[in-house]
Design a protein with these regions (language model features):
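Short, conserved micro-motifs enriched in small and acidic residues
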Residues: 52-60
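Terminal targeting signals and extreme-terminal segments of soluble enzymes
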Residues: 26, 33, 61-62, 70-71
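Catalytic strand-loop segment that frames the active site of acyl-thioester-processing enzymes
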Residues: 1-53, 127, 143
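Hydrophobic beta-strand-centered segment that forms part of the acyl-chain substrate-binding groove
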Residues: 50, 63-103
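Short, charged/polar low-complexity linear motifs in solvent-exposed/disordered segments
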Residues: 31-32, 43, 71-72, 77-79, ...
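HotDog/MaoC-like acyl-thioester-processing domains
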Residues: 1-11, 92-151
Length: 151
C-alpha cells in the first residue's frame, strides 16, 4: 500500500502580506478585473471603503500550504505522487484588503488509506485573528510506477 507520510493533526502554516501587486498580477493572469479588486474609486463608495483581494487568490494561498505539507511528506521519501482532487466547502467569510497579513493553517483532518486520500481543514486568518476564508482540501496519493519512486 502507498505510504502517505501524513498523520491526523499534522499541520503547516503559510503567511503573507497581500499587496496591490499580488492582486493586479492575479487579475492579469485570470482576467478577473472586477472593480471590487482593481477600481479604488468604485470601492471607496462601497460598504468596504477599499479594494478587496480576490477570493480565488486566497484559494491559491491555500494551495501553497498544501504544497508545504506535500514537501514535508516528500522529504520522508514516498512511493506515490500526491495530487489535488480539489477543495470542498470553500467559503469567503470576510474581505481581505490590500496590506492585510494573512495566515493559512492547513491541518490533516481525515485519512482514507483504502482510497489513498487525505483531507485537510484549511483556515485563513487576517492579522486581527479574524477568520476570512475556509475550505476542505482533498489530496490523492497516486502510487508511482514500480521502480520509479518520487525523489
Amino acid at each position: 500500500m502507498t505510504a502517505m507520510h501524513v498523520a491526523l493533526g499534522d499541520s503547516v502554516r503559510f503567511g503573507k502580506t497581500v499587496g496591490e501587486t499580488d492582486v493586479y498580477m492575479f487579475a492579469g493572469v485570470t482576467g478577473d478585473f472586477s472593480g471590487n479588486h482593481v477600481d479604488e474609486v468604485y470601492m471607496k463608495k462601497s460598504k468596504y471603503g477599499q479594494r478587496i483581494a480576490h477570493g480565488a487568490l486566497m484559494v491559491g494561498y491555500m494551495s501553497t500550504a498544501s504544497t508545504m505539507m506535500i514537501d514535508r511528506a516528500l522529504a520522508k521519501g514516498l512511493d506515490s505522487t500526491p495530487v489535488s482532487l480539489g477543495y470542498d466547502r470553500v467559503r469567503f467569510l470576510a474581505p481581505v484588503f490590500f496590506g492585510d497579513s494573512i495566515r493559512v493553517t492547513y491541518t490533516i483532518s481525515e485519512i482514507d488509506r483504502d482510497r489513498q486520500r487525505s483531507r485537510a481543514k484549511v483556515e485563513v486568518h487576517n492579522q486581527h485573528g479574524d477568520l476570512v476564508a475556509v475550505a476542505e482540501h482533498i489530496l490523492k496519493w497516486v502510487p508511482d510506477k514500480p521502480g520509479e519512486a518520487a525523489a
